[in-house]
Structures are given as C-alpha cells and as structure tokens.
UniProtKB/Swiss-Prot annotation:
Pfam families listed in its UniProt record: Cpn60_TCP1
Protein source organism: Dictyoglomus thermophilum (strain ATCC 35947 / DSM 3960 / H-6-12)
GO cellular component terms, A-Z: cytoplasm
InterPro entries hit by this protein: Chaperonin_Cpn60_CS, Cpn60/GroEL, Cpn60/GroEL/TCP-1, GroEL-like_apical_dom_sf, GROEL-like_equatorial_sf, TCP-1-like_intermed_sf
Database matches in NCBIfam families: GroEL, PRK00013.1, PRK12849.1, PRK12850.1, PRK12851.1
Subcellular localization: Cytoplasm
Protein's recorded name: Chaperonin GroEL
Description of how the protein assembles with itself and partners: Forms a cylinder of 14 subunits composed of two heptameric rings stacked back-to-back. Interacts with the co-chaperonin GroES.
Family: Belongs to the chaperonin (HSP60) family.
Gene3D superfamilies reported in the protein's UniProt record: GroEL (3.50.7.10), GroEL-like equatorial domain (1.10.560.10), TCP-1-like chaperonin intermediate domain (3.30.260.10)
Length: 538
C-alpha cells in the first residue's frame, strides 16, 4: 500500500486555502462585462479561449497534493452550480473564496468552527428567502433576451436568438445547439413530432425535386411488429382505400411482399402510402410509439396488447394534418390526438424527469417532452475559425441554461446588486451564541464581493462603487459596461434568481467544509524509477 502524507491544524487549512486561491484568482478575472479571457492549452489541437468559470476551473490541477485538494473543492463549487443552474460559476467561486478568507480570520482568532458554520448556514437561508422576495417572474420575450445576453458575455445577438427560440417552442420545448458549416449563426424550427427514421422505399416519394414524401391528412398505423406478409395488413389497406386518404405505417420493419404491395399500389395510384421504421430501441421505442399514438389519437398496436394486425379498424389509426418524410427523418405535423390525453402524457413524462438520476435518460425524456409539447428549435452556430466556433457554442449553451433557470425561478437585479440588497435582512437572523453571530457576519461581509470584483475588472475602485450602490435603493446598481449607475431591471442587467441562489448555497457549503477541516491525508507521490541504460552493443 502506498505511503500517505498527513497534514494537521493550521498547516492543513493554509495548504487548502493556497490551492483554493490559485483557482479562484484565475477564475475571478473573467467576472463582469469587462472581465478578461483565459487561454487553456490543449494537448491536441488549438488552445481554447474562454471566460467561463467552470471550464477554467476544471483545467487546473496542482502539483502539491494538499493544495490540489483545495483546488478540487473549488472546482466542486463551480461544477455543482453549473449542473443546477447552468451559469454563475465564477460568482460561486468568488463567494467561496471570500467566505473562506473571512471565516479563517475568526477561526484563527479562536472562534469555534462548528458554531461559525451554523451561523453561515442560518445567514444563507435568510439570504435565499430574501432573494425570492426580490425576484420577479420572466414575463416578456425582452426579459429572456436580457438574461441570455448577459450570460453570453453581453452578446445581444445571442440573447435575441435564444429569446426567439424560446418564444417558438415554449418553456417545455427543446433547444439544441449544433455547429454550422457557415460563418453565420441561425435558428431553425422543427415543427411537430420529428424522429430519425426515413421512408423505407424511394418509390414512396411524392416530391421528386426535394426527395420527400408528403402525405396530407393521412391515417397512421402505429405498431412495434415486423410486417412481412401482406395478409396481415390487407384488411386495413382495403378500409383505408375506401376513405380515399393516404396511409402511413410506423412499424419495427416493413419488408418482403408487404412492402412490395404498398409500392405497387402507390405506383398504380390505388393507395398513397408511406412506410417508416419505428424510432428508438427497446423500451424507449415502445414509449416513443405510445407518444406518437397519443399525439395522433391512434392506438399503439403491440404484441402485449393482444390486438392482431388483421383485426385493426379505422378508429384505431392515428390522424394528422400532414406527414413529411425524407430518407433520414420523418415529421408528423398537427397530430389530431385528444388534448387531455396529450397533457396527461406530458405530466407523466415530467414526473419521470423529476425522478431520474441518469443524465442520458433526462436528455431523452426532455426530447420526448418537447416533441409532444410543441417542437424543437436548433441553433446552428457559425464562426470564422474553429477556436471562435467552440467559444461561441459554449457561450450559447451557457446562455440557454441561464434562460431556463430564469423561467423557473424568475430574475433579480444583476451586477452583484441582488446579493447586496439582502445584507439588511441579516439583521433579523436569530443566533444562539457569539460564534454563530460571527458566521452571520462572515456572510454579510462576503455578499458585496461580486459587485466589487465586477467594478475592479472594469478598472474602477470596487469598494467605492459598492458603497455608492449601498446608499441607493431597490434595483439601482452599477452598469460596468457603460460606467454609470442605473435601474438594473430597466437597463436589462439581470440574473436568474436560481443562478444567484445556487452560487451562494454551493459556495457556503464548501466554505463551511474548509473552515471545519483539521486534517488532510494525501497519497505520497511516487518517485519515478530510473531505468538503467541499455547494455552496449558489441
């Protein structure tokens, strides 16, 4: 077993703080509209330029094992905030550093770390309560554009793009970010239910110019069976022919004489039809087919339900305004399902979303939810160079997360003002002893740090700016981009309440851990064994 290094008391805490400071000092130069960028070296390919706190923090590993522990703890603050709220990672890191430094002064002076921790927790609870009171709901497209622009480093173009996408797909819709081949960033909207399966035969095309099959007002047969014998679908084909409407078959596969029959009938003009493979795999396929059935008001014909294909009647088929398919994907537009059934299905998927721990499952459930609720928007990111493309894509993803957070819990004044306005509320925190009061004071002293830093990064004296803002009321604050004092809501300088809340909670959690740490145990680095030189050749 490898030998361990042990460090105790003050020595341990000092090493932790050194590591924490290295990460925080690298990250904090990016805060605010006048924050700088950091260039990250990559082993392969071009370096990455970013001003995203969590991306920078993740790249830092230190040689000293004790210092590295401190660095890893700050990374945890940034990652956790990023996971929960999608933004605010730099603010969280800066707050953690401020809380630790303030707390350390008192712990060294003899305060009991456990009581100090309790005081910090009580103060944070009060601040979170106050933030909820300050927050106002996101009501307009303009609000969304402001939140997204601030998160994307004051890029109004990105802000407007995300606001447009949100407006089109609604708050349950999915917005995906992809890389574009061109240099412009565009927004594409996918209407209705789209899945990645195309037509099974090119003979089914109705629009040769666009290589698409477009069927108006079709009947839709939805099954997870493989159809190869024509006798299985002959009864339903005859019934659909009598209505004069086209037929779409979504099945595990359609092959052999069944497919040949559909093609021949199409070519002869007897029945316009389209056969498509079912999307997904395994249980997910069944769930997606069930979604399609509910969306179109049809019945999912499965082996488990015991309905034979021969016995399918017209009322078991789904209906839609239009189905469009090319060789890669199929889109069902204007499904004619019962609204209540669709809403119940959406509620069911939302419940599953809350209960799942898997990131992959969450993503897939989110996609299914969007397809039922209103569609998918795709933002195609364009840029002149690979490095710029990566950086821009990253900013858009950040802005998207921040926007979703804003829709959930509302917005608060940005630029560090919201935290500053909660300081007065700390007067009401009830404490049991002097050390708990010290914990509350530590939080009080740390709440103006983000605002000071934003001003410092803009080349101003942070302490003076913070004092001026403290003298003002409500949403009044400092606009660092234009060097003026404004109403933050009116100027569009806003943060999602969820981002500010998560940043403080995660920072306080890690700070409390550092302050109550008395010992560190780390692996002793192994010395590299020197290999003897090869024997000389004779």
């Amino acid at each position: 077993m490898a030998a361990k290094l042990v460090s105790l008391d003050m020595q341990a805490r000092t090493a932790l703080i050194r590591g924490l400071d290295i990460v925080a000092d690298t990250v904090k130069i990016t805060l605010g509209p006048k924050g700088r960028n950091v260039v990250l070296e990559k082993k392969f390919g071009a370096p990455v330029i970013t001003n995203d706190g969590v991306t920078i923090a993740k790249e830092i590993d230190l040689e000293d094992p004790f210092e590295n522990m401190g660095a890893q703890l700050v990374k945890e603050v940034a990652s956790k905030t990023n996971d929960v709220a999608g933004d605010g990672t730099t603010t969280a890191t800066v707050l953690a550093q401020a809380l630790v430094h303030e707390g350390m002064k008192h712990v060294v002076a003899g305060a009991n770390p456990m009581y100090v921790r309790r005081g910090i927790e009580k103060a944070v609870e009060k601040v979170v309560e106050e933030l909820k009171k300050i927050a106002k709901p996101v009501e307009t497209k303009q609000d969304i554009a402001h939140v997204a622009a601030i998160s994307a480093n004051n890029d109004t173009e990105i802000g407007n793009l995300i606001a447009e996408a949100m407006d089109k797909v609604g708050k349950d819709g999915v917005i995906t970010v992809e890389e574009s081949q061109g240099i412009t960033t565009t927004l594409e909207l996918v209407e209705g239910m789209q899945f990645d399966r195309g037509y099974l035969s090119a003979y089914m095309i109705t629009d040769p110019e666009r290589m698409e099959a477009v069927l108006e007002e079709p009947y839709i047969l939805i099954t997870d069976r493989k159809i190869s014998a024509v006798s299985e679908i002959l009864p339903i084909l005859e019934r659909v022919v009598q209505t004069g409407k086209p037929l779409v078959i979504i099945a595990e596969d359609v092959e052999g004489e069944a497919l040949a029959t559909l093609v021949v009938n199409k070519l002869r003009g007897v029945l316009q039809s389209l056969a498509v493979k079912a999307p997904g795999f395994g249980d997910r396929r069944k769930a997606m087919l069930q979604d399609i059935a509910i969306l179109t008001g049809g019945q999912f014909i499965s082996e488990e339900t015991g309905i034979k294909l021969e016995n399918v009647t017209l009322d078991m088929l789904g209906r839609a305004e239009k189905v469009r398919a090319n060789k890669d994907k199929t889109t069902i537009i204007g499904g004619k399902g019962n609204k209540k059934d669709i809403e119940a299905r959406i509620a069911q998927i939302k419940k599953q979303l809350e209960e799942t721990d898997s990131e992959f499952d969450r993503e897939k459930l989110q996609e299914r939810l969007a397809k039922l609720a209103g569609g998918v928007a795709v933002i195609k990111v364009g840029a002149a160079t690979e490095v710029e493309l990566k950086e821009k894509k990253h900013r858009i993803e950040d802005a998207l997360s921040a926007t979703k957070a804003a829709v959930e819990e509302g917005i608060v004044p940005g630029g560090g003002v919201a935290l500053l306005r909660t300081i007065k509320a700390l007067d009401d925190v009830k404490v049991d002893n002097e050390d708990e009061r010290i914990g509350v004071e530590i939080v009080r002293r740390s709440l103006d740090v983000p605002l000071k830093l934003i001003a410092n990064n803009a080349g101003k004296e942070g302490s003076i700016i913070a004092e001026k803002v403290k003298e003002m009321d409500g949403p009044m604050g400092y606009d660092a981009a234009n060097d003026r004092f404004v109403n933050m809501f009116e100027a569009g300088i806003v943060d999602p309440a969820k981002v500010t809340r998560s940043a403080l909670q995660n920072a306080a959690s890690i700070a409390a851990l550092v302050l109550t740490t008395e010992g560190l145990v780390a692996e002793k680095p192994e010395k590299e064994k020197q290999t003897p030189p090869p024997p000389p050749e004779y």
